[in-house]
Amino acid sequence: MYYIGVDLGTSSVKLILMEPTGDIVNTVSKTYPISFPKPGWSEQNPTDWYDKTCEGIKELIKDIDKDKVAGISFGGQMHGLVILDENDNVIRPAILWNDGRTTKECDYLNNEIGKDKLTEYTANIAFAGFTAPKLLWVKNNEPDNFKKIAKIMLPKDYIAYRLTGVHCTDVSDASGMLLLDVKKRDWSEEMINICKISRKQLPASYESYEKVGCITKEAAMELGLPDNVCVAAGAGDNAAAAVGTGTVGDGMCNISLGTSGTIFISSSNFSVDNNNALHSFDHADGYYHLMGCMLSAASCNGWWMDNILKDTDYKEAQSHITKDMLGNNHIYFLPYLMGERSPHNDPLARATFTGMTMDSTRTDMTQAVLEGVAFAIRDSFEIARSLGINITETKMCGGGAKSELWCTIMANVLGIKVHLLKSEEGPSMGAAMLAMVAAGEYENVKQAADSIVGICRTIEPEKDIADRYNSRYNTFKDIYPALKGVFEKM
């Protein structure tokens, strides 16, 4: 049998065709436009998502026996607002996760409703990217559109609706709406009232691995598939990626070292960071997770190499950093090129080099960039540990994970094992695995992950290096507070 995983990204949809063994049969990617109608705004047409997903599915399955396709599921960009009228037509373009128009609405929620109340109701506070502030923006600025709303949906769930006719979402994606009581895994009545909506306007919520239905006869005819293809609810992109990397079960962790950085920590217990440095969301495996977000991760090294050194040979630049140099560098780098989310929630934070002398070299500064990102990731780890979560190992993926040196630095800064993966298909692979569970191929998400996800290499910390980094991390922690007031004046 075959399973389709759909990763609905911001610029493209990526699809994967997998067998239950984890073997990848085919992959396809289709792009679609994004519009910026005003500075800070970011929108897309939901019908573009569906059209390109259908194109991709047809191409994905063209060379196989279509009757052997057993399931499909989704991972997708989170937080986007899709609103439908009573005839299920899209009312206006979707407002995306990276849209920044909701400053006033976030101020209202965080200051007038109050961060403590929001945390009580949803386990999170308001950020510009979240869905509830967007909903309030429509209410305040497009009242006619607000009155037309019959259903409030998220991006990937619009695709599921078009394929099944079911208005649904999953708890991992819904966690990022600021409308879900994360602990109870159900809609928050308080937030429903605050946003002046009704429960019937919200989709039915499922666990990520649950079957929401089968594709309709119309969708089956359009795609050339049988109409008994099982559709699973799917997950938000980070939770789907966590499934795809095997980050399921208590205390499991995944670090995604891409342009931005994500620290994803799975836990069987619900916990909230009262300082709001980490998000508390539901996980796709039925557990919970804490998530830290760095706005600049591998992009720090890209900036350093491309903009400053004007050098594209990343491997050569890092080859001069020897093992005995690890933990002995005198330069510190704050990796806040675009401000920072976790743990500071400070858009005014800036990147800095600190500690240069006449003896400092290009290699020292290259090393400092790699170490600065690792120290910033440790900030999120320390918060999770303070909440009683014991992290002993992590998966690592993304472009930065291709650097063996960076992975070695990470293992020693964090003091834990770092596992590198055989496959990095991420959200699409996780989505396909969720479809397998929904179709009965596996009993649960952990069983699927244990059977499919492979580790190609493990890097372990070395005590002497880890001890040196512990000392340096304590100094790193002092730099941002010392400069915060300076950043505010810039």
Where do the protein language model's features map onto the residues?
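Active-site core segments that coordinate phosphate-bearing ligands/cofactors
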Residues: 4-5, 103, 110-125, 133-166, ...
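Short loop/turn motifs at secondary-structure junctions
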Residues: 65-68, 196, 201, 390
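Residue-level signal for inorganic ion chemistry
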Residues: 22, 45, 72, 99, ...
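Short beta-strand-loop/turn "lid" adjacent to the catalytic site in phosphate-handling enzymes
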Residues: 58-97, 125-131, 160-181, 204-207, ...
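N-terminal glycine/serine-rich phosphate-binding loop of ATP-dependent small-molecule kinases
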Residues: 1-92, 120, 148, 220-221, ...
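Short, acidic/small-residue loops that bind anionic groups at enzyme active sites
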Residues: 92-106, 421-422
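Generic detector of well-ordered alpha-helical packing
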Residues: 8, 20, 46, 86, ...
